[in-house]
Amino acid sequence: MGWLFLKVLLVGMVFSGLLYPFVDFSISGETRAPRPNIVIILADDMGWGDLGANWAETKDTTNLDKMASEGMRFVDFHAAASTCSPSRASLLTGRLGLRNGVTHNFAVTSVGGLPLNETTLAEVLQQAGYVTAMIGKWHLGHHGSYHPSFRGFDYYFGIPYSNDMGCTDNPGYNYPPCPACPQSDGRWRNPDRDCYTDVALPLYENLNIVEQPVNLSGLAQKYAERAVEFIEQASTSGRPFLLYVGLAHMHVPLSVTPPLANPQSQRLYRASLQEMDSLVGQIKDKVDHVAKENTLLWFAGDNGPWAQKCELAGSMGPFSGLWQTHQGGSPAKQTTWEGGHRVPALAYWPGRVPVNVTSTALLSLLDIFPTVIALAGASLPPNRKFDGVDVSEVLFGKSQTGHRVLFHPNSGAAGEYGALQTVRLDRYKAFYITGGAKACDGGVGPEQHHVSPLIFNLEDDAAESSPLQKGSPEYQELLPKVTRVLADVLQDIADDNSSQADYTQDPSVTPCCNPYQITCRCQPGE
């Protein structure tokens, strides 16, 4: 075990017979008018084209497609960043990474997380009297006060980071494949640096590790059951509730086994997409059964598909980033091309959100924070600025106006982490830095700086294939506008009360339920 014996923090295991032993469902304080329950479901690495309602070629999302027909579908909805931790931090704070401090992903050994002076959506609603729960992927810090149990969630059940950041006994399908957890104390290591073999993937309930390694093949159903049970209990408490579900899907490894289990077959991805769709359907069915008239269900993706996983990655739909593919590399996850941050998104609230509506409003994950806070009758945290806006008028079909301007930060493909290198202005998009992420063929597009930005008209060129001619009147009219809005936001960020995340690493903070077992192995009942 080496350093595990000496350095890994021992996390005690407590197996409770009660599902929510630490959640207080009782009513306290004065009685208020009914406030909506909130269910946020965030898919992982799901492409815009993975939603059947978006892309006719997709036939595997019957529950989500039904939700789209019964609610609102957003076709110009964007992640706040193109990778996991920054996107999730922005969802929970309404602020870009340059403000909240989270500009790239946290590691298994990360000491820090989302800065503690940043206020999360769960903390705001908890203070407003909501009972709160998070189920699934967190990826905003797991050590000490960065754990979700200390960030506003009364209950937590899930994996603290991505489900490929630890070995398992049933490793599922990955590209390249990763081995199962070692069963002996040998020093063998997989030569692929993307595979984890030292420490098994942990499953938490509140502050306790309840399974390590987690059984990925049963994880989706566990998440569904915990979500359904929380909704059932919370709906009878007399208090409004917030449920945030961070899905393990569609991130590799894919754990389902379709009839023809060829690791290179798109059938694997489709089977996993169907499993995710079923999970979402179970949550929606429970909402419909116990809290239909007073619950907003908001579904979205955290970023685009992970193209380097080849056939185990999703579909960008028409947003193929052709200019970048001609330069090399992928225009999907980690990049500021549309395929990296334009994500599927749906809102469902019978009687409030109109039925079978497609919204073209320019929206972002950043907007969930201020919108939900407004619906809950709470107040935004003071002494800081927000990049998201209250879009409840859009949700209720009273407006098609969202943002006029969005900024897309570097998420690992080119440039400095978090830097605002791309500007969306109405139907136009300007790139000051371009670069491709690692593609299926292993290629990475070169980092290129554009003093005069590349500007694309997305209305005419969704594939981002041909930028405007720099000498054209259209380009010359746009250039000063783009330059000005970028300068304005950078000055606004400089004047803001911004945070800085701690990205230092220490092996001793690695989640481990039993450092005396190879890979920290322990199972329920041991």
Curated annotation (Swiss-Prot):
UniProt record, GO biological process? gene expression; glial cell differentiation; homeostasis of number of cells; lysosome organization; neuron apoptotic process; retina development in camera-type eye; sulfur compound metabolic process
Give residues annotated as binding Ca(2+): 44-45, 84, 302-303
Q: How is it modified after translation?
A: N-glycosylated with both high mannose and complex type sugars. The conversion to 3-oxoalanine (also known as C-formylglycine, FGly), of a serine or cysteine residue in prokaryotes and of a cysteine residue in eukaryotes, is critical for catalytic activity.
Pfam families in the record: Sulfatase, Sulfatase_C
Catalytic activity entry: an aryl sulfate + H2O = a phenol + sulfate + H(+); Hydrolysis of the 3-sulfate groups of the N-sulfo-D-glucosamine 3-O-sulfate units of heparin
Q: 3-oxoalanine (Cys) occurs at which residues?
A: 84
| Enzyme Commission designation | 3.1.6.1, 3.1.6.15
Q: Where in the cell is it found?
A: Lysosome
Alphabetical list of InterPro entries matching this protein: Alkaline_phosphatase_core_sf (IPR017850), Sulfatase (IPR050738), Sulfatase_CS (IPR024607), Sulfatase_N (IPR000917)
Q: Which residues does the Swiss-Prot or TrEMBL record annotate as the active site?
A: 84, 139
Q: Tell me its cofactors.
A: Ca(2+)
GO cellular component annotations of the record: endoplasmic reticulum; extracellular space; lysosome
- How cofactor binds (record note)? Binds 1 Ca(2+) ion per subunit.
Positions binding substrate in this chain are: 137, 162, 251
Q: Which GO terms describe its molecular function?
A: arylsulfatase activity; metal ion binding; N-sulfoglucosamine-3-sulfatase activity
- The question of whether Disulfide bond is a record keyword is answered with yes
Query: Where are the glycosylation sites?
Result: 117, 215, 356, 497
**Annotated signal sequence range:** 1-16
Tell me where on the tree of life, at the top rank, the source sits. Answer: Eukaryota
Q: Which UniProt keywords apply?
A: Calcium, Disulfide bond, Glycoprotein, Hydrolase, Lysosome, Metal-binding, Signal
Q: What does this protein do?
A: Displays arylsulfatase activity at acidic pH towards the artificial substrate p-nitrocatechol sulfate. Catalyzes the hydrolysis of the 3-sulfate groups of the N-sulfo-D-glucosamine 3-O-sulfate units of heparin.
Similarity comment: family membership: Belongs to the sulfatase family.
Protein name (database record): Arylsulfatase G
